[in-house]
Design a protein with these regions (language model features):
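A short, N-terminal "cap"/entry segment at the start of jelly-roll beta-barrel domains
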Residues: 1-34, 40, 46, 118-167, ...
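Double-stranded beta-helix
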Residues: 92-140, 225, 229-252
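Short acidic-glycine-tyrosine-enriched beta hairpin
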Residues: 71-87, 205-220
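Short, charged/polar surface micro-motifs in flexible loops or helix N-caps
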Residues: 29-31, 39-43, 63-64, 110, ...
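Short strand-connecting beta-turns/loops that link adjacent beta-strands
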Residues: 29-30, 52, 71, 98-99, ...
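Short, conserved beta-strand element in jelly-roll/cupin
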Residues: 37-39, 49-66, 106, 172-174, ...
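Short strand-coil-strand connectors
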Residues: 29, 67-71, 153, 164, ...
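Short beta-strand His + acidic residue motifs that chelate non-heme Fe in jelly-roll/DSBH
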Residues: 45-47, 66-67, 75, 85, ...
């Protein structure tokens, strides 16, 4: 079993028009990941809830007009911000501008999201309930520079947000960082998205080059790791489910 490595443009295209684009990056049952681009003025999702999974967003560029909670409180989500919406919280979003919006969307567990996009099945999504659902305060919103930051000798690890079904971390490394030795997991999907720098992703006995915008996912049992060619690197690291990973980082 090999990890998956692709660029956003290589993801399975559900929509690809000048004004909007959506591509599937990962469709494992434990973690669905998509990449989306919306031109200014494009509508995103009407207010809704999920009963059984977390809906997460990481904004790569632009500004997302997010609305959450019983009162649909507005939250301006700028580039570098993570949002994790737990089950039972009403949420919706649009791109009110200025400019283009690009973001990653996480569903953990998947609960049929990519099958819904492919028009192959039902999805864990409901209209807002009569009681308004859970409070907006239950949503995790981590702005750029926020989160739990742990400074190591050759890197900084920041827990941007974590729930039992998903944790999202930011890994920022110095040129002397040697990487992550090959390993595997049996209880989670371990995924990375390159924000800055050049990365060597281990796939079996080979090392594949990953530039900014590359996505790398190791499903359970897949041997994976990272090599640093010698530069500064910034990576998102997504674990679905968390499976104790955030607490392990805190304990180091």
């Amino acid at each position: 079993m090999q990890p998956l490595l692709l660029t956003t443009s290589e993801g399975e295209a559900i929509v690809n028009r000048p004004e909007r684009e959506l591509r599937i990056l990962c469709d494992h049952d434990w973690l669905h990941v998509t990449w989306t681009r919306h031109a200014e003025g494009q509508r995103g999702a009407e207010p809704h809830i999920h009963l059984h999974h977390v809906d997460g967003f990481f904004v790569l560029a632009g500004r997302m007009a997010l609305r959450v909670g019983p009162e649909l409180e507005p939250v301006g989500v700028t580039a570098g911000t993570l949002v994790l919406v737990p089950p039972g919280v009403v949420h919706g979003f649009d791109n009110d501008g200025p400019g283009e919006l690009r973001f990653l969307n996480f569903h953990a567990p998947g609960c049929g999201f990519v099958q819904y996009l492919r028009k192959e099945g039902e999805f864990d999504q409901q209209p807002p309930p009569a009681d308004g659902g859970r409070l907006a305060a239950d949503v995790i919103v981590t702005l750029p520079g926020g989160g739990e930051r742990f400074q190591r000798e050759d890197r900084a690890v920041t827990i941007l947000g974590g729930l039992p079904d998903i944790s999202v971390l930011l890994l920022e490394v110095e040129p002397e960082w040697t990487g992550i030795p090959p390993h595997d997991h049996d209880d989670q999907v371990d995924a990375f998205f390159v924000l800055e720098g050049e990365v060597g992703f281990i796939a079996g006995d080979a090392v594949a080059h990953g530039a900014p915008g590359s996505f790398y996912a190791a499903t359970p049992g897949a041997r994976h790791g990272i090599e640093n060619p010698g530069g500064r690197i910034s990576l998102l690291n997504i674990h679905g489910p968390d499976a104790g990973f955030a607490d392990w980082v805190r304990s180091q």
